[in-house]
Amino acid sequence: MDYDIIYIGSGNASWQGARFLRKAGLKILIVEESLYGGACANRGCNSKALLDAPYEIKALADNFEGCGKSGNFEVNWSELMKLKQKRIAGMSIFLDNKFDEYDLDVAHGKGVILDEHTVQVGEDKFTTDKIVLCTGLRPVIPDIPGNEYLHDSTDFLDIAELPKHAIIIGGGFVGMEFASILAEAGLEADVIIRGDMALRHFHQPYVQNIIEILKEKNIRFHFNETVREIIKDDDVEIANPLQKVLNVKDGMNSDDTLRDPESKIDNRAYEDAFTVNCDSGLSLKGDYVIAAMGREANLEGVGLENVGLTYTKSGVKVNGHLQSDVPNIYASGDVADTGIPKLVTVAIHQSKYLAKELLGEADEIVYPVVPAVVYTIPRIATVGVPAYIGEESDEYEVHRIRYGKSYSLELKNDLTAEAKVVVDRDLNIVGAEIYAAEAENVANMFAFIINKKITLEELDDMIYAFPSSSSVCLYKLHNIHYKF
């Protein structure tokens, strides 16, 4: 065999564990057809975090409007994009150097499985004892007329100028996070959602808070709508619509155009304009249409049919050892269908576990409680047992902690910050929902508490850095412990 293990994909699902296998003496090949590092490093989390940061700061500054803030806080998107491109471009180069440092072989091109022990990359064929699929997910593009006009998350995170009026199809992570950026940039957008709720895996009262904030900033929501087609129009003038049919073709006076009476943005002529038609008759116009309808397994053309391995949009079904139905083929990261949230942190956990598994040192994989965050402005986070389960079960109590109203957090004027903490009958914390500007940090704190089974009494014996959102939240847990 040429290699002990071939990884198809170079993201966190592969190299995080591959380096340990190489250190143990195994010969490793990583196959990559695009940039080293995968989606998160190059066209996902990292890009989004950098582009979002100035708007987060702007929102915090706006909290002091009329009580300390002077002047306007403006974000220069083109300059921000230059910074993003510079930073992200360095990521693939950084990993290329790291792969050399770890003594990992790399083949650049699409990896195709020919049989259970052979992978082809271009004209080269490599034999291997085991194969690990780490191909990740790709954006879902609906099979509808005009889908060639759709942009996915990769496009938006590399756009030179923000659209004047975007239409976002989807109300999940991507759709809501992009809507927040557009709202803070003072632009308009329509969000089309197929079901009756956005961010269905997050605490709905907090989601509704976000929706109301976005509505106040010219983001409109259309629920229970299915997009039928997308049409590219001639040069037109687009109003700011909230109507069933918007028709502003040449010859129509702008005064005749139905428009949102609360709109704060004037009509503008767009060089490119698109009409999005829905089954209900809803018709919207904009200059940029984003497909934010989720992601699906990126396995087309990988050759799974050559080994009789099937998959779904959720990926390859694996057992508790991340092993597929073909014994020597494994899956790690987003492409593994495990029922666990598809997050980069989970991919890292799986990759490190798989290194132990392939060395014969592991039992079935065990997942800690996984925190999840949607980076809207403000953030929403969830970890452990959801509040709605706690509210419906006699096994739990749900305590609402409005820590933003504590005097320490008022220094940041984040007055709406709060958490709903789920405790069991023994007063052990088993879950939390957080709504705050710094929700991700508080979620990580709760994840640590839950995973390490730290009791309320033990928390009460600790001393924390103050003032901080976590310290105030923890102090208020004292009231649960002593039933104040």
Which role fits each region the language model picked out?
Residues 148-163, 269, 283-357:
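FAD-site-proximal beta/loop scaffold in flavoenzymes
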Residues 45, 135-188, 220, 305-307, ...:
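Glycine-rich dinucleotide-binding loop and its adjacent helix/turn
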Residues 9-12, 33-34, 171-172:
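Glycine-rich Rossmann-fold phosphate-binding loop(s) that bind the pyrophosphate
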Residues 2-3, 19-26, 31-162, 195-199, ...:
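Glycine-rich flavin
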Residues 1-5, 10-16, 23, 216, ...:
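Mid-to-C-terminal Rossmann-like scaffold of FAD/NAD(P)H-dependent oxidoreductases
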